[in-house]
Amino acid sequence: AEWGGGWGGHSNPDYGRIVTLGTDHLREIISENSKKYPDEAWFYRSCSNILDALDIFGKRYGEEALKQAENCDNTEDKELLVRMAKAFEAVPKKPAYDFTSAICSFMLIFALDGSDSPGRFDQYMYPAYLKTENKGEVKELLGRLWEYFHDHRSWNLCISGSDENWNDESNELTYLILDMVKKTGYNTPNLTCRIHKN
């Protein structure tokens, strides 16, 4: 699902579905819905085509990451490229298994869709954050992501908020993002913090 106009920067793709479910699971949903709604078969075919493109894009990114890792002299960069190549063996077809793989899935959609709003980043990335043993990797990746956002205009990133019963949905990732914004001083992406009565 996507909200917004047909111009860059004013839409919010549902990154969370790809990050948490993967394209294989989304294909199952598409298949079920195309049987339920045969008059909309053209729409579901186009959805499948987009998922195919995303998978091809991911495969190419994985190959490129491995190629760059082989020629990289910087130890830190080489380790990241190897982690990315490993991640792209799974994502976007499968759900993200840690923060590196979640960032890889996110970036595929972000690049393919044309640098739109990251949306409620701390919410859909949090499950992957919890699966990541080395939280230092999360900070490193957030730092690199914020540099990317700064160099390639992105629009609105939303944090915090509540559920339908006013339970606070802030989490550790919410505060890491706030720290990153404070540390970098960048105004891209625009940061929206949802405040609620509790």
Predicted regions and their residues:
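Short, Lys/Glu-rich amphipathic helical modules
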Residues: 65-81
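Extended non-globular scaffold/tether segments
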Residues: 45-56
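Conserved catalytic cores of very large enzyme subunits
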Residues: 1-47, 76, 80-88, 94-198
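Extended amphipathic alpha-helical scaffold segments
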Residues: 61-66, 126
